[in-house]
């Protein structure tokens, strides 16, 4: 099965959860699944900027990316976070390869809004490299950085990067492993299953807001692009990925209808 696993930056900030997730991804690859990983790193980015006296500014939940910040994006997302994750996956037994959307125009982007600086909107994807690597037993690990044909580099929302890669790669499942238990209803209970229509209703009624609204919108885009199933699940739950692949209902499963 072709899988796209998106790892939230908060999970990667903990050595214990990072090591556990890497073991699970390596096990999924060993079981015959073709796995591509996309990762965030917002928490690590904020810490990096704070240590250097650079303020983190957000507009509509998106990080304003100045020339100073885009340099940090490359160093943190495509540098330290990506390389540490690749090293951990290799130690776990996977053959991981670190990438970003810039590599072979894997994911192309354009400037979203001048007010946001170098924040990109995905405009296209070229999955040949993902197919080549996964077909030969490798696990691509993609940082949320993309570019255009003129060489401009953009910071791209990691959830949108995951959707772009999942859709282009032809993933059967897109699994968001995050720091929440799933999608909550208005009684603060996890919804085990959501259709696309029910997801839109949670957004329209203001129940899903902020980061969860962004994840639901990303999931809806993935479903519309042909991904069969999207899951939003707690990555820190013991054996979360293995249990999901075994059919256990963890977090929230999203389907078209």
Curated annotation (Swiss-Prot):
E.C. number(s) listed in UniProt: 2.7.2.8
Catalytic activity from the UniProt record: N-acetyl-L-glutamate + ATP = N-acetyl-L-glutamyl 5-phosphate + ADP
Main location: cytoplasm
One GO molecular-function entry: acetylglutamate kinase activity
An example Gene Ontology CC term for this record: cytoplasm
Positions with a binding annotation for substrate: 41-42, 63, 155
Localization annotation: Cytoplasm
Pfam families per record: AA_kinase (PF00696)
Keyword field contains Secreted: no
Superkingdom to which the source organism belongs: Bacteria
SUPFAM superfamilies, alphabetized: Carbamate kinase-like
Enzyme class: transferase
Marked site (Transition state stabilizer) residue numbers: 6, 215
Example GO biological process: arginine biosynthetic process via ornithine
InterPro entries noted in UniProt: AceGlu_kinase-like_sf, AcgluKinase_fam, ArgB, Asp/Glu/Uridylate_kinase, Glu/AcGlu_kinase
Keyword flag Zinc: no
Protein family (similarity comment): Belongs to the acetylglutamate kinase family. ArgB subfamily.
NCBIfam families: argB
Function: Catalyzes the ATP-dependent phosphorylation of N-acetyl-L-glutamate.
Protein name stated in the entry: Acetylglutamate kinase
Organism the protein comes from: Solibacter usitatus (strain Ellin6076)
